[in-house]
Amino acid sequence: MKKQALDPEAKTKPHIIEHLGISALRSTHPEVRKLKRQQSGHSAHGNKVWRSSFVLMDYLTTYPPEPASQVLDVGCGWGLTSIFLAKEYAANVTGLDIDSGVEPFLQLQAQVNQCEINFQCGGFESLTATELLAFDLIIAADICFWDEMVDPLLDLFRDA
């Protein structure tokens, strides 16, 4: 897989990361900082742009979904991979996250990138096989950070 370099002009845009046509606002961006001041905190690491989103975006350029796919982004966080799929492949993306506090950040990122992402607050372990059938593709990046998540993730893969 060819590695995609991040924006070489990053020094002129210190609060934005440009990658594969997506503008990702960093946690230092004034609008992001404003949202952070309005919240009491995050419970599940949804507090910044995670580099794993860019790795997954790179992967998806090599193995793209069908255009206009129904996509579930498990542990979507600020939604950068969701935004990439919506913009690049006209995907209808639902971002799922256990942290309701990420939704304003996801919507801000989507607004900056002129696309829409559906947000659903909840855990993947509660999704049924029937619910999963509504999606053509299920993606996730950097979500297995607690040992007790391994078995529920395996169940998700089996049900999908």
Pin down the residues of each PLM region.
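S-adenosylmethionine-dependent methyltransferases
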Residues: 1-160
